Amino acid sequence: MPKGDGKLIAQNKKARHDYSIIDTMEAGMVLQGTEIKSIRNSRINLKDGFVRIRNGEAFLHNVHISPYEQGNIFNHDPLRTRKLLLHKKQISRLETETKNTGVTIVPLKVYIRDGYAKVLIGLAKGKKSYDKREDLKRKDVDRQIDRTLKNFSR
């Protein structure tokens, strides 16, 4: 999480597996009352989420926030599109990055900082299947090295 301490609510582990993250930035979310209550209960899924920029504004798509259990007829739509709060310079930079190169914007983490729900978004480039296999092999080798060093030091 960037600067400051916040309570981590959800993490998109699949994003780091499917994409190589180039850059990250923090954005606020425009939410309804029942949505923030569900987020505080960790009822959010970032797995298929992505960010699209339209008319100079950033929107979060395909992020599932479960309906609030104590909500009534005013409960929210779980998959609705949510606006992200970013500075104009940040939005224009994201827009140029996504138009020129083959990168996309994915949500990485959702956390609450100072009472506000924040999302950490990342500029991501898709990995090929051989890159994914290579990363898994590298992690496995690192784990084995750590294990042998731990046993050797005893």
Curated annotation (Swiss-Prot):
Tell whether Transferase is among the UniProt keywords: no
Q: List the disulfide bonds.
A: none
Q: What Gene Ontology cellular component terms go with this record?
A: cytosol
Q: Which domain of life is it from?
A: Bacteria
Q: Which PROSITE patterns match?
A: SSRP
Subcellular localization(s) per the UniProt record: Cytoplasm
- GO molecular function list: RNA binding
Instruction: List the keywords (alphabetical).
Output: Cytoplasm, RNA-binding
InterPro entries, alphabetized? SmpB, SsrA-bd_prot, SsrA-bd_prot_CS
Q: What CDD domains does this protein's entry cite? A: SmpB
Q: Which SUPFAM superfamilies match?
A: Small protein B (SmpB) (SSF74982)
**What is one GO biological process annotated to this record?**
trans-translation
Functionally, this protein is described as follows: Required for rescue of stalled ribosomes mediated by trans-translation. Binds to transfer-messenger RNA (tmRNA), required for stable association of tmRNA with ribosomes. tmRNA and SmpB together mimic tRNA shape, replacing the anticodon stem-loop with SmpB. tmRNA is encoded by the ssrA gene; the 2 termini fold to resemble tRNA(Ala) and it encodes a 'tag peptide', a short internal open reading frame. During trans-translation Ala-aminoacylated tmRNA acts like a tRNA, entering the A-site of stalled ribosomes, displacing the stalled mRNA.
Its protein name is SsrA-binding protein
Name of the gene: smpB
